[in-house]
């Protein structure tokens, strides 16, 4: 699938911001216009003096702070980079993120597969 190199570059740069061993980045875009980027990260909170860590998926991170009703018809690209950043890997969105994107109205979801190719997520 041919996407703008700017969109792919933005997704890779977002993935590089992750502190996880497995680095994922996501870009919400409409046409060639990038609306938001996100990466997988740890969100921690303190509750009764106990620390709890929760992971925030790259797709969720990219959607934070955006007006969801304005995203209908937008697209998303999700990429995974290796630790050495030498190649792209499988970044197929999980079921929870797919349901969230469907609920919001994200029209097209693209991701990198095991071969590092950009593919479109098949609709159910």
State where each predicted segment sits.
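Short beta-strand scaffold segments in enzyme catalytic cores
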Residues: 23-32, 36, 110-111
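Zn2+-dependent cytidine deaminase-like catalytic core
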Residues: 36-124
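Short, basic/aromatic recognition patches
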Residues: 1-22
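Secondary-structure boundary/capping residues
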Residues: 20, 24, 71-72
């Amino acid at each position: 699938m041919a996407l703008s190199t700017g969109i792919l570059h933005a997704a890779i740069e977002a993935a590089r911001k992750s502190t996880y061993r497995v680095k994922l980045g996501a870009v919400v875009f409409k046409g060639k216009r990038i609306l938001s980027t996100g990466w997988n990260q740890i969100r921690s909170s303190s509750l009764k003096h106990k620390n709890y860590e929760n992971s925030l998926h790259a797709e969720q991170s990219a959607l934070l702070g955006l007006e969801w009703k304005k995203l209908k018809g937008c697209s998303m690209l999700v990429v995974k980079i290796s630790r050495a950043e030498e190649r792209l890997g499988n970044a197929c969105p999980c079921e929870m993120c797919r349901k969230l994107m469907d609920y919001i109205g994200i029209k097209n979801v693209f991701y990198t597969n095991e071969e590092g190719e950009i593919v479109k997520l098949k609709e159910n």
